[in-house]
């Protein structure tokens, strides 16, 4: 018989009774605040069409690299989990794939995925027993049946989750038709996009040739000419802003920036376009384009996010058989102080610019990132990211960053996920961890309770809204409830 599934109301709170009491009170202030999700990777077509999700495997398992990478590490084939390969979606029975997942669910004990998924199973679907092999079919049937109902369509879940803003991420070579459909539908949900130009900046990316072709189509520019290439970016950035975007996102291998002259930059671009691509030239161009994007932000106001330091697609065999984003991305050492200096020397004191830095290298928190953000007015620190968005990772971030950068040089939490149903769980974890961190400071008499109460609301709601300029969005983009309240 499966074990009972229950979520303790004090989960993730300190074990010391006095400190735990403070954490409870702080969490109570933010538990029901709206979710601000300013950076993520959900599919905008979900909200444009509002079509029902297919089944448990299609929604929860096959797209989630957090899940299938763990099972793959234990010898489970991706085909058995119905994960898409370059040949297409395998013909594996989705029920059988779910059974495989259920029989291996114990592998996630101690991981954030264990917390998130059990939150989804308990709070979203109402399960009262842990998932295991014996109840795999019951889980599959109940989840799949629920997904067929109107209450579990994407827009209904968006409203149920109390999401105020949700940002997706698209490239300049991609259509924004789904965002247009959302806006024209009359639905009040605030779903916006973000500008991610990596595929038309990184000449080492195998997607680059096709992305350039589509970039030319979407922008109407000759993107193989340097000046027209930059103009294409400006035009597409404005199109993204018209679709609600307030930020751009840059996932380069390193944090390198450069400040070449116009002549040098054009010569480098021309060389790359002609096919003379070397690792050194590709890296220099990526570095220069971060500075070019920053210069454009001075004019159009997009907040820059820099997500460096991932060795993408480390497993070459899996890349060849299944393509990108199959759980084989590995964190790398990342240097920021010298890497960012060219950009910061050029633009680091300009009040029109805002850059949010992320890292997969936790050794840089106190040595590089906190001192940089604690000095340069253009810099803020993004929350613990990807491999570190666990309760422990969130606590390490606060402990190592706060002493130098404080709280107000950070931007609150963002979930950065494709897993739509896990968004409330991820934000709940962040709210609990921040409550626990502040509770400890109150218990140690490092701040009083009133200060902690102000801070927990800022960390949860006000800071992400301000950092991503969501408090400046046009009236059409505000939820109907907020528009009505303002009238």
From Swiss-Prot:
It catalyses: D-glucuronate = D-fructuronate; aldehydo-D-galacturonate = keto-D-tagaturonate. GO terms for molecular function: glucuronate isomerase activity. Its EC number is 5.3.1.12. Pathway: Carbohydrate metabolism; pentose and glucuronate interconversion. It is an enzyme of class 5 (isomerase). Keywords: Isomerase. The keyword Mitochondrion does not apply. The keyword Translocase does not apply. One of its GO terms (biological process) is D-galacturonate catabolic process. PANTHER family: URONATE ISOMERASE. HAMAP family: UxaC (MF_00675). This is Uronate isomerase. It comes from Caulobacter vibrioides (strain ATCC 19089 / CIP 103742 / CB 15) (Caulobacter crescentus). The gene is uxaC.
């Amino acid at each position: 018989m499966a074990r009972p599934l229950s979520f303790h109301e004090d989960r993730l709170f300190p074990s010391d009774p006095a400190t735990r009491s403070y954490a409870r009170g702080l969490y109570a202030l933010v538990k029901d605040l709206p979710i601000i999700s300013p950076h993520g990777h959900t599919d905008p077509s979900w909200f444009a069409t509002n079509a029902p999700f297919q089944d448990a495997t299609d929604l929860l398992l096959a797209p989630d690299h957090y899940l299938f990478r763990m099972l793959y590490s234990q010898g489970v084939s991706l085909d058995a989990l119905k994960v898409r390969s370059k040949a297409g979606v395998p013909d594996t029975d989705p029920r059988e794939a779910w059974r495989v997942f259920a029989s291996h669910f114990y592998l996630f004990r101690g991981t954030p995925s264990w917390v998130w998924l059990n939150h989804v199973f308990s709070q979203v679907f109402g399960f009262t027993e842990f998932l295991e092999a014996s109840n795999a079919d019951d889980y599959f049937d109940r989840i799949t049946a629920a997904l067929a109902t109107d209450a579990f369509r994407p827009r209904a879940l968006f409203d149920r989750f109390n999401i105020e803003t949700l940002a997706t991420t698209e490239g300049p070579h991609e259509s924004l038709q789904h965002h247009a459909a959302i806006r024209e539908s009359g639905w009040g949900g605030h779903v916006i996009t973000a500008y991610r130009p990596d595929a038309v900046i990184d000449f080492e990316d195998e997607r680059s040739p096709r992305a350039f072709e589509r970039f030319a189509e979407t922008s109407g520019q000759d993107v193989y000419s340097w000046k027209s290439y930059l103009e294409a970016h400006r035009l597409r950035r404005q199109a993204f802003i018209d679709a609600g975007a307030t930020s751009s996102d840059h996932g380069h291998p390193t944090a390198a920036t450069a400040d070449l002259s116009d002549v040098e930059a054009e010569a480098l671009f021309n060389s790359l376009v002609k096919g003379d691509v070397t690792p050194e030239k590709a890296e220099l161009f990526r570095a220069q384009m971060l500075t070019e994007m920053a210069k454009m932000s001075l004019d159009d106001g997009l907040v820059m996010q820099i997500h460096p330091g991932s060795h993408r697609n480390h497993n070459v065999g899996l890349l060849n058989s299944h393509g990108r984003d199959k759980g084989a991305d590995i964190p790398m050492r990342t240097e920021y102080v010298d890497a960012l200096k060219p950009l910061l020397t050029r633009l680091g004191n300009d009040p029109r610019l805002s850059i949010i830095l992320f890292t997969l290298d936790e050794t840089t928190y106190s040595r590089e990132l906190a001192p940089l953000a604690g000095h340069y007015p253009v810099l803020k620190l993004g929350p613990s990211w990807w491999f570190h968005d666990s309760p422990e990772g969130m606590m390490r971030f606060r402990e190592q960053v706060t002493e130098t950068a404080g709280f107000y040089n950070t931007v609150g939490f963002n979930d950065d996920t494709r897993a739509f149903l896990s968004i409330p769980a991820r934000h709940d974890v962040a709210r609990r961890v921040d409550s626990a961190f502040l509770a400890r400071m109150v218990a140690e008499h490092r701040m009083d309770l009133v200060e902690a109460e102000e801070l927990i609301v800022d960390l949860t709601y006000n800071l992400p809204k301000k950092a991503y300029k969501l408090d400046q969005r046009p009236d059409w983009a505000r939820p109907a409830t907020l528009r009505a309240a303002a009238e």
